[in-house]
Amino acid sequence: MAHSQLLSSEERLFCYRWFHSLLAKELSEPQLQALQAGQFASFFALLAELGFQPQVTDLQNELAKLTAYDSPRLELAADFAQCFLLEGKLSALPYASYYLDERDLSENLAVMDQWLTKFQLKINRLHNEPSDHLCIYLEVLIKLIETEQPVQVQQQFIRQQLLGWLPQWAEKTAQIHSSTAFYQIISNLLLGFLQQDIA
């Protein structure tokens, strides 16, 4: 059953904002401390209720393992770079253009441009990211929910704009060898959450 039938708009917004905050850039010290201090326990419980208990358990285990490092945040920052910032053979670049062929990418970005214009979202403002970066897609999806666009429109966006390439990205992320499995788990969880959101 789609999340739109199980969760309130506020809950779905929280979920997608959470994913965006973890994948937009390296975690800050306050973000990591909040995760390790159990401030997201109720959110993790919600994810478990939705069928993601294995991923939640894995994530909690990874957070516990981080305490063994002298500088957990720097360890995660290195993993973020390893997973997402190196060249294509070494990282799982979070860009649609890396996974779609020219025709599909052109169609995908044409739709993205329409939504970016409609919502007046600015690109290259803070992180110098092109419009095919995963977090730009999440920003548009968040706007679709915030502005109460019809559920069918939201699901079409997920299906056509994201799920045409995100499974390949998540699979590539899973193959990256990093110190922790934090980002591999987050990527898998995001994919599963999106797939369930249109079920």
From Swiss-Prot:
The keyword Chaperone applies. Belongs to the TorD/DmsD family. TorD subfamily. HAMAP family: TorD. It is found in: Cytoplasm. Gene3D superfamilies: 1.20.120.1820, HscB, C-terminal domain (1.20.1280.20). InterPro entries: Chaperone_TorD, DMSO/NO3_reduct_chaperone, HscB_C_sf, TorD-like_sf, TorD/DmsD_chaperones. It comes from Actinobacillus pleuropneumoniae serotype 7 (strain AP76). The keyword Chaperone applies. PANTHER family: CHAPERONE PROTEIN TORD, CHAPERONE PROTEIN YCDY. This is Chaperone protein TorD. Keywords: Chaperone, Cytoplasm. One of its GO terms (cellular component) is cytoplasm. SUPFAM superfamilies: TorD-like. It holds the Pfam family Nitrate_red_del. Involved in the biogenesis of TorA. Acts on TorA before the insertion of the molybdenum cofactor and, as a result, probably favors a conformation of the apoenzyme that is competent for acquiring the cofactor. One of its GO terms (biological process) is protein complex oligomerization. It comes from the Bacteria.
